[in-house]
Amino acid sequence: QATTPWLSFFLAPLGYCFIGLILALRQQQFQFLHFVVLFLFFVAIYLQENSYRKLALHPEKKKWPVIVLTNVILFVILFYFYQTVAIRVVLLLFAIVLFNHTNLFEVKVNEVSYIYHLLLNGIAKYYIANFVTVYVLSGNVTSAISAQLFQYVLFGLYVSHIKTKLTERKEGKRHFGPTAAIFNVFVSLSWLVGTVVYYLWYLNHFNILGIILFSLSLLIPILYQIHFRKQYTVNRLITYLHWYLVVMSVLYGFFIAI
């Protein structure tokens, strides 16, 4: 099935870099080996994030074997890019690794620190990751592309936030408070904000197909709220959300002005 939980290990990393891949292909640039290694890096990041979250929720488990193993894999890949691309790429990828380590700590959604945690990880995985992908594959990222890539973070924040809430529900550790209530409203609607931003941004570059497809994409989070949220298990819902990011990656990849 399309929502089989194991698919998340492919879809989530794809959501980090698919826009960058499509943009590179549109510029007729593609470094196959670089992309394979970069994709493995994002797979390792996702595995590390999942492992760290479980360790944060269950502090009685041993952390060091997971920390050492995942970081050895990541640093081997960083060394590859240091040898083949540029130090600036290594520094950006290292920032993703660094922010990913915040998942070692249990951050409750009713705490102010959760806001910083979500924003930093969202920017790292959904902006920096795509930025690096474009740069590694094409060798150039224009200021126009850079600005447009940032819009995608809004969709990434939505998915990351809902995943956190689903994990809390699964673990029976739900948290409430004024910080959660205010921030929850904004992030839970960031998919809608992102679509509105798309309409406004491309007002002078009106594309009827883009408008139609972005409008249809609104059905995915709407169906999540009114139907799938009550029908699927937590793991299947997470896969559903990863599919949403892949869809949005395809739309942004093809309709970003380059």
Residue ranges with predicted function:
Residues 10-20, 66-76, 117-134, 179-193, ...:
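Small-residue-rich segments of transmembrane alpha-helices in multi-pass membrane proteins
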Residues 1-51, 100, 106-121:
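Topogenic membrane-insertion module of multi-pass membrane proteins
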Residues 47-57, 99-113, 159-171, 222-231:
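C-terminal ends of transmembrane helices
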Residues 56-61, 183-190, 200-258:
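Extended hydrophobic alpha-helices typical of membrane-associated regions
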Residues 15-21, 42-46, 68-80, 93-101, ...:
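Hydrophobic core of alpha-helical transmembrane segments in multi-pass integral membrane proteins
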Residues 38-71, 151-198:
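Solvent-exposed interhelical
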Residues 13-38, 73-90, 127-149, 195-208, ...:
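Helix-coil boundary and interhelical linker segments in multi-pass alpha-helical membrane proteins
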Residues 63-138, 224-225:
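Intramembrane alpha-helical segments
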